[in-house]
Design a protein with these regions (language model features):
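Cap/lid segment of the alpha/beta-hydrolase catalytic domain
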Residues: 15-74
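Serine-hydrolase catalytic core
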Residues: 155-240
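Hydrolase active-site cap/lid region
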Residues: 109-157, 212
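Active-site signature of alpha/beta-hydrolase-fold catalytic machinery across serine-
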Residues: 30, 109-113, 200
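Gly/Ala-rich beta-loop-alpha elbow adjacent to hydrolase catalytic centers
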Residues: 98-107
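Conserved acidic catalytic loop of the alpha/beta-hydrolase fold
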Residues: 75-93
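Proline/glycine-enriched tight loop/beta-turn segments at coil->beta junctions
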Residues: 5-13
Length: 241
């Protein structure tokens, strides 16, 4: 992890979870500078299977198996929940769980499963994982030929993979303790996250706010940081105290 604190003492912490394939902290370090200027501390988590936590034999950030993907996601959610508990015990009265893309999905799960009020700001993320990996742009990163060899055909491999991912849906769980302290950012030109999945998460988290940006997944991450940072700040302002 990398914990950064502003010049003056603060009781506010923003937990930044990694996007797909994001190793190290330099992107989130740059993103966090305006948050530090607002008086917020930030904590970035290195995912299991990424960066210094890669298992032996894994090259770069590409995961080798479906099992590794599930293991990484479960670890990220559990670690984010543990960080939220640690932060509360350490004197941070306001905590926001946030991330972009995969990080947003994991932040949503962690916020929903945290038994006390936290702010949440999932950015470029939706309700379910299956459409991301089977229908959207990220499906091109999956080695369908290898899965097809094991299961007999690509169509059978896709159905099997979709069945495996069906339970990975935030709406299976209750909304966060204080849903009004959640702000979702959806992207109108997103080739990775279907708009229907963003709407589904918003409907499930009754009381949350949904803000749309008219841009693509990659452009939103690279050039719309100010909108993301405003949403994080606004979500924190909706926590009590």
């Amino acid at each position: 992890v990398e914990l950064r604190s502003p010049a003056k003492p603060t009781s506010t912490l923003v937990v930044l979870l990694a996007a797909t394939g994001e190793e190290g902290f330099w992107l989130r370090r740059r993103f966090s500078n305006p948050l530090l200027a607002r008086g917020f501390a930030t904590l970035s988590l290195e995912n299991a299977f990424y960066g210094v936590r890669r298992p032996r034999g894994q090259r770069v950030s590409l995961l080798r198996t479906v099992r590794d993907q599930f293991a990484m996601n479960v670890a990220t959610v559990q670690e984010a929940r543990a960080i939220a508990r640690w932060a509360r015990d350490a004197g941070y009265d306001r905590v926001c769980l946030t991330g972009f893309s995969q990080g947003g999905l994991m932040a949503s799960f962690a916020a929903a499963l945290t038994p006390f009020a936290v702010a949440a700001c999932p950015r470029g993320a939706g309700d379910a994982a299956a459409p991301i990996f089977t229908n959207a742009a990220l499906s091109r990163r999956i080695h369908w030929a290898r899965l097809s060899a094991e299961l007999g055909s690509e169509s059978r491999a896709r159905r099997y993979f979709e069945d495996c991912l069906k339970p990975v849906r935030i709406s299976r769980f209750p909304a966060p303790e204080l849903a009004k302290a959640a702000i979702l950012i959806g992207l109108r030109g997103d080739g990775f996250i279907p708009a229907a999945e963003v709407d589904a998460l918003h409907r499930h988290w009754q009381g949350a706010e949904l803000r749309w940006l008219t841009t693509s997944h990659v452009i939103a991450a690279a050039f719309h940081s100010a909108a993301h940072q405003r949403a994080i700040s606004d979500s924190l302002s909706r926590l009590p105290g």
